[in-house]
């Protein structure tokens, strides 16, 4: 494992080309690559192949384009996803023809539902050779159509066809701009090449046209915001925040809203909103609600920002009490009716809207002399009570996932990025969050467990500081080879909760009582993590009781490596189940 001092500019490990600067003689590949650079994409993750030879040659000739080589397309796509999540700019993926493209699908789907910009580029044979029993061919245009903002198809372009060269330039500009426009997301460019594929010419820098978009992030007109502020001044308001990229503007806006005397905040760990501690307390307070409180603390209006919520309890509660109004903002798709109570969607930039709304509500509350509402007091008291019970329960409980992770989350330094895997880990983070680290990430767009390792690796490469992946043994087993990756450095540390497979199946109602649960659902992967770390030269630590975390965790934070947390699966499940019957 390399240390972070061995990384090149901006903490990236890049492949340095040693051959002379020879460019591809395929004009469409040159134009595409030059437009990527002009639009300032974050870099290109290349999966080697034959049909994408022109793109690879073009990329290798351009020293101002960052490049990473990852042969497995599935891993490459998740690595690009992690990079784009941190950098908030598009990263390009390049693969060969055939099924290679479909290996991008899981990461592209995650990017689509998490609103992360990616440029998936697939090389293809000429259209006349599709479905002609030629090798490594299938119908590629539109292959990802349900999980991208738009698909583009570029035909074979000759060196003398100016109209088609203009078409390539325009299409690639459009694709990149679309990936970042309004709600960001992935796009797919399929580009056809005829043979020969490996022809070269001496590299010569060419100027390509760069198209720009002028954005407008203004809130609604002032008179409308004033009207909304007057309408909501005495209403019981709840703001829910799912996964979000970090944003200083949104942070400030939500902070201002949270200070109002008629507002309570339900912010999930992945919201990246650094607020007062009680804002993150969600599940336990809801389970502690008495029947009478369930009605008196019912919000009149719910305003939602961010992506899909982790908390099933919050969703169930709001579906049950049915707020009079539910508003979603511009980062949510029109028609997303999570609580079955949707009344309005504002196609606005959330930070600007919330900032203006908070100011307007505050103005009208002061004008009317309104004090802190019983609604706000009730939620604040309930959350504080839940936090005390959480601390008391964790302290008195035995060694378990809950106890280990509650301890670990309090020890993670503020300057670290944290990547959470799906299943139990992200839910434990919800229960134990008292403050947020620098940035919290996870694959919650579609909530699969398959790509977490490489997404975290990509995120670590894109961040100047250090990143910690917190994952379970089943999720980690999808790509344990990550610890031997050429891009693995001590910028990424890994914590694996070894609970004998999919621990969530010991908790959810649908599976926890099934006799076949362990074999068919939990499916223990039996990882030999210590041996794998030794083979890779990666520092290894292990804890199977509380004192081991006290003894080893600080050293782990300094050296990086892998920290395995071993717990008894049945005892951990029982402790978690009992947690939710606290009163």
Feature-to-residue mapping (PLM):
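Active-site diphosphate/adenylate-binding microenvironment
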Residues: 29-33, 47-51, 55, 380-464
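Conformationally flexible catalytic loops at phosphate/diphosphate-handling active centers
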Residues: 11-24, 62, 169, 174, ...
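Thiamine diphosphate
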Residues: 121, 128-141, 428-583
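Glycine-rich, anion-gripping cofactor-binding loops and their flanking helix/strand elements
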Residues: 103, 241-327, 335, 435-463, ...
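A short, small-residue-rich loop immediately preceding and capping a beta-strand
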Residues: 42-45, 66-68, 86-125, 298-306, ...
